[in-house]
């Protein structure tokens, strides 16, 4: 039983201001210099490489230096074209694009009938007025951001068709002036601080002897709590070759295995190291961990395999499949949140019922479709020319998966996913950690 992907009800974008002032200025040619096709192409590439970061600065892991996003865009243009654009010129160009886009949007909304949507009634006129006011309060960054714009414009009574699609991707919440940034997030792709692979509390046993028979071998050694075990997880692309032939490519994969008591316990990572990479508001990772149980929280580092050619989109299917096992008969709810810079972008909630098999209860989420955001994300990653550029993007992209008992709301599993691109020819790889707080 699957639900649709949904966006947050309210935008979680940049704090930078000046949107309404930008709308009042006439649209002139970019006074900061001509943006030739090669510069414009590099500018668009840089927007994809360096995702929006609000008031934060970005630390390049290979240099250890802090940059505002506009500084990084200017730096990228210089590296790609040999031509110089300052961060102020980048900021000016963003404002020019935003003013142009705002005029287009306002022109659409000012029509009496927009995409067959009648504003003649008082209720409809109120929705239109709210939309106009919303645009007037948006920053330049939000206007050219597809995600931020659609979130901001998700007003009651105003359908999506009433405003035009905003082109671009990863163009959300651009910092207006990188130099004024104060919220520095010093998170780089350095190895996590690990703790020894010691037995979990409650599972200690003499060396060489298994715990009591009531404690299964997978506890503490796999993605598993005392009530639910993830057997398998995969995100994949299926492409139809002919009527009866399909080619399946695994982007990420956790395969089935048979753990034994002789296997080492999972290494532990302090959950506070990753708090800022996931939502912090109500229902976020911190609150979930405080609620417990402690043995239900895991970090999975994926090295994704993007080495595939997408030949025909019309014959392609992007999906996720997962399997779980439990000693208990219950109804589970699986929430999957896609996050950028710690902010939720989209969420999917699925409900699954148990099937009794061989003395246990099995749960299968089979071929759940990926959302459009994720499909676009994969396409943009694949078009970046270098793996280090892909990893720079992925450094601020995370997924939070929470599996709960639908009836009791107890957390059964909470899995934080972080990503890099696989540098191996052997496909996708992964490593699993326990999340702890000492």
From Swiss-Prot:
Which keywords belong to this entry? Activator, DNA-binding, Nucleus, Transcription, Transcription regulation
Which segments carry the region annotation Disordered? 1-36, 195-217
Gene Ontology cellular-component annotations: nucleus; transcription regulator complex
PROSITE patterns from the UniProt entry: TEA_1 (PS00554), TEA_2 (PS51088)
What InterPro entries does the record point to?
TEA/ATTS_dom, TEA/ATTS_sf, TEC1_TEAD_TF, TEF-3, TEF_metazoa, YBD
Bias (Polar residues): 1-18
Q: Where does the source fall among the domains of life?
A: Eukaryota
Compositionally biased residues, Low complexity? 205-216
User: DNA-binding residues per UniProt?
Assistant: 28-104
For this chain's UniProt record, which GO biological process terms are given?
DNA-templated transcription; embryonic organ development; hippo signaling; regulation of transcription by RNA polymerase II
Instruction: Give one Pfam family.
Output: TEA
What would be an example GO MF term here?
DNA-binding transcription factor activity, RNA polymerase II-specific
List locations, semicolon-separated: Nucleus
Keyword ATP-binding among record annotations = no
In which tissues has expression of this protein been reported? Enriched in cardiac and skeletal muscle.
Q: Does the keyword Cytoplasm apply?
A: no
Q: Which PANTHER family match?
A: TRANSCRIPTIONAL ENHANCER FACTOR TEF RELATED, TRANSCRIPTIONAL ENHANCER FACTOR TEF-3
Give the protein's function.
Transcription factor which plays a key role in the Hippo signaling pathway, a pathway involved in organ size control and tumor suppression by restricting proliferation and promoting apoptosis. The core of this pathway is composed of a kinase cascade wherein MST1/MST2, in complex with its regulatory protein SAV1, phosphorylates and activates LATS1/2 in complex with its regulatory protein MOB1, which in turn phosphorylates and inactivates YAP1 oncoprotein and WWTR1/TAZ. Binds m-cat elements from muscle-specific promoters and differentially activate transcription. Isoform B has probably a transactivation capacity that is lacking in the other isoforms. Isoform D may be defective in DNA binding.
What is the protein name stated in its UniProt record?
Answer: Transcriptional enhancer factor TEF-3
């Amino acid at each position: 039983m699957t639900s649709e992907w949904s966006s947050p009800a309210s935008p979680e974008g940049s704090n930078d201001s000046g949107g309404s002032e930008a709308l009042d200025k006439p649209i002139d040619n970019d006074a900061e210099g001509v943006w030739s096709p090669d510069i414009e192409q590099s500018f668009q590439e840089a927007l994809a490489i360096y995702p929006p970061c609000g008031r934060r600065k970005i630390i390049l892991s290979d240099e250890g230096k802090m940059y505002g996003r506009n500084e990084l865009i200017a730096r990228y243009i210089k590296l790609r074209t040999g031509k110089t654009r300052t961060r102020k010129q980048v900021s000016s160009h963003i404002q020019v694009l935003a003013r142009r886009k705002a005029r287009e949007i306002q022109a659409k909304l000012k029509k009496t009938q927009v995409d067959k949507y009648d504003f003649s009634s008082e209720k409809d006129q109120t929705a239109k007025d709210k939309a106009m006011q919303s645009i007037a309060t948006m920053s330049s960054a939000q206007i050219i951001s597809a995600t931020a714009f659609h979130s901001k414009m998700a007003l009651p009574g105003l359908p999506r068709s009433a405003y035009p699609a905003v082109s671009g991707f990863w163009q959300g919440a651009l910092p207006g002036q990188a130099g004024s940034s104060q919220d520095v997030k010093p998170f780089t792709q350095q190895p996590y601080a690990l703790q020894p692979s010691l037995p979990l509390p409650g599972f200690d046993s003499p060396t060489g002897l298994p715990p009591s028979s009531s404690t299964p071998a997978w506890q503490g050694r796999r993605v598993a709590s005392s009530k639910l075990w993830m057997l398998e997880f995969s995100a994949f692309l299926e492409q139809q070759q002919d009527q009866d032939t399909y080619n399946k490519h695994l982007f990420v994969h956790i395969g089935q295995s048979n753990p034994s008591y002789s296997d080492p316990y999972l290494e532990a990572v302090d959950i506070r190291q990753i708090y800022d990479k996931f939502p912090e508001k109500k229902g976020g990772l911190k609150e979930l961990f405080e609620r417990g149980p402690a043995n239900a929280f895991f970090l999975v580092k994926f090295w994704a395999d993007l080495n595939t050619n997408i030949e025909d989109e019309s014959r392609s299917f992007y999906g996720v499949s997962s399997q779980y096992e439990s000693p208990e008969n219950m109804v589970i709810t699986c929430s999957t949140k896609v996050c950028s810079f710690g902010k939720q972008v989209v969420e999917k909630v699925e409900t699954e019922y148990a099937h009794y098999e061989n003395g246990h209860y099995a749960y299968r989420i089979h071929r759940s479709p990926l959302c459009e955001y994720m499909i676009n994300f994969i396409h943009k990653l694949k078009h970046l020319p270098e793996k280090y550029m892909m990893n720079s993007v992925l450094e601020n992209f995370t997924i939070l998966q929470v599996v709960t008992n639908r009836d009791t709301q107890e957390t059964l599993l909470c899995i934080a996913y972080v990503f890099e691109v696989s540098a191996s020819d052997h496909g996708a790889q992964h490593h699993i950690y326990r999340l702890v707080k000492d």
